[in-house]
Structure formats: structure tokens, C-alpha cells
């Protein structure tokens, strides 16, 4: 009997293992089955089963995000990231992928080469590499003919959240997402006096020198 695992079998084993893990992680945890009361030493049952047996472990919904859990529970806990951009202002873009023309941005799709169809457990990884290469070639800076844009380097300067630009201008921003095997890109313009944020946001000019539109974002608003 051959005891060595072939390369094509490795992907199937990994995929099977991930499917099993996802099955158990997605299944709700029943509190009544989480502990066996018959095996617990008398006297310590209230401590061990007090929290898990009160109710099933529930993941927070959208209305409960940001709330802190009281006490300690068992099992996996969702990671809740507290917002650190509360004071940055601007209007957050709720779902950039479904933005329509006229909202100040444009959605494009980086289609994959139909002749390249990776298979197996690493299919998404290979497709992501292809999408990355196409995005790099897609967003090549072109010579600008009108509104100047200040070059921005994260971490440079005196740490001011707003780069100095007495003439005003716009900064092009992108939100990249991987959706059903395709790379979708939402792009829009923000005034260069606005802060750089991790979330996709529309900002208004604070310095009074930035134009309402530039040569890059004129097409974002559709025909005049």
C-alpha cells in the first residue's frame, strides 16, 4: 500500500477538512448539550453550567454590533472591532459595490481571462493573484491636464491628518472587493484636505480651495 499522499489528493483532503470545520463552526451551539451534568462533581455545577446553560450562544446581529458582552462565556467569540474613525467626519459609503452612477463614484469589474481557470483548493488564491496583477495594470497613473493632485505618502510629514495644499485638489480613492470570482472596484474622489480613512467615505472640502469636480471625477456623475 502506498503510504505517500499524492499532490492532487492533498487539495481534496484540505478542502474536506475545511468543509468539516465550517460545518461545525456555522452550527449553533446548544446550551443543554454543551456539558454533561452527570459527569460534574456536586457543588461545582452552578459555576460550570451557569452561563452556557442559561441560553444558546448567539452571535450579535447588526443592531448589537459594538456592544460588550457581560461575563465570560464558552465557545468561540466573534471579533468586534471598535470604530476608531468616529471623529473623521464624512459620509460612509454603505455598500460601494452597488453604488449607481450619479452618486459620485463609478463601479468597474476586473474580469478574469476565460482561458485561465484554476481548480482545486487554491482556486481562489490563484484568481486573487490574477486579479491583483490586472488591478496593478488597471490603475496606472495618467498625466493630468487640469487640477493638481498632491502626492501622498502614508506616514510621511509631521503626522498631520490633512496634507498641506494651498491650491486645493482631489485625491482618487478605491475600494476593492472579491465577489463571486471577480474583482469589483469602486472608485471616487475626495478633497485632498480630507483625512485618509480605512472605510470608504465621501468627504467635503474643509480648506475652501478644493474644486467641486476635477478631470478625474467628472465621469463619476454621468452626462451633464
Swiss-Prot record:
Its main location: virion. Signal peptide: none annotated. Zn(2+) 2 binds at residues 193, 205, 207, 210. GO terms for cellular component: host cell cytoplasm. GO terms for biological process: symbiont-mediated suppression of host cytoplasmic pattern recognition receptor signaling pathway via inhibition of MDA-5 activity; symbiont-mediated suppression of host type I interferon-mediated signaling pathway. Residues 57-98, 144-172 are annotated as: Disordered. Keywords: Host cytoplasm, Host-virus interaction, Inhibition of host innate immune response by virus, Inhibition of host interferon signaling pathway by virus, Inhibition of host MDA5 by virus, Inhibition of host RLR pathway by virus, Interferon antiviral system evasion, Metal-binding, Viral immunoevasion, Virion, Zinc. It is found in: Virion; Host cytoplasm. InterPro entries: Paramyx_V_Zn-bd. Zn(2+) 1 binds at residues 170, 189, 214, 217. Gene3D superfamilies: 4.10.80.340. One of its GO terms (molecular function) is metal ion binding. It comes from the Viruses. Belongs to the paramyxoviruses V protein family. Interacts with host IFIH1/MDA5 and DHX58/LGP2. Forms with host DDB1, CUL4A, STAT1, STAT2 and STAT3 the mumps virus V-dependent complex (VDC). Plays an essential role in the inhibition of host immune response. Prevents the establishment of cellular antiviral state by blocking interferon-alpha/beta (IFN-alpha/beta) production and signaling pathway. Interacts with host IFIH1/MDA5 and DHX58/LGP2 to inhibit the transduction pathway involved in the activation of IFN-beta promoter, thus protecting the virus against cell antiviral state. Blocks the type I and II interferon signaling pathways by interacting with host STAT1, STAT2 and STAT3, and mediating their ubiquitination and subsequent proteasomal degradation. This is Non-structural protein V. It comes from Mumps virus genotype N (strain L-Zagreb vaccine) (MuV).
Amino acid at each position: 500500500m502506498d503510504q505517500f499522499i499524492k499532490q492532487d489528493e492533498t487539495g481534496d483532503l484540505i478542502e474536506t477538512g475545511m468543509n468539516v470545520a465550517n460545518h461545525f463552526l456555522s452550527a449553533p451551539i446548544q446550551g443543554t448539550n454543551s456539558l454533561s451534568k452527570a459527569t460534574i462533581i456536586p457543588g461545582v455545577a452552578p459555576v460550570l453550567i451557569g452561563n452556557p446553560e442559561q441560553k444558546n450562544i448567539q452571535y450579535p446581529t447588526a443592531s448589537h454590533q459594538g456592544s460588550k458582552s457581560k461575563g465570560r462565556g464558552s465557545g468561540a467569540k466573534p471579533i468586534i472591532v471598535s470604530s476608531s474613525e468616529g471623529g473623521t467626519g464624512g459620509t460612509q459609503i454603505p455598500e460601494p459595490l452597488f453604488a449607481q452612477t450619479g452618486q459620485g463614484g463609478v463601479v468597474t469589474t476586473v474580469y478574469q481571462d476565460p482561458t485561465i481557470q484554476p481548480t482545486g483548493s487554491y482556486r481562489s488564491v490563484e484568481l486573487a493573484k490574477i486579479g491583483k496583477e490586472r488591478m496593478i495594470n488597471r490603475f496606472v497613473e495618467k498625466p493630468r491636464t487640469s487640477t493638481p493632485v498632491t502626492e501622498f505618502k502614508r506616514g510621511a510629514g509631521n503626522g498631520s491628518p490633512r496634507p498641506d495644499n494651498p491650491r486645493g485638489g482631489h485625491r482618487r480613492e478605491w475600494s476593492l472587493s472579491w465577489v463571486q470570482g471577480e474583482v469589483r472596484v469602486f472608485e471616487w474622489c475626495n478633497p485632498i484636505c480630507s483625512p485618509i480613512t480605512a472605510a470608504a467615505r465621501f468627504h467635503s472640502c474643509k480648506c475652501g480651495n478644493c474644486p467641486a469636480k476635477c478631470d478625474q471625477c467628472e465621469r463619476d456623475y454621468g452626462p451633464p
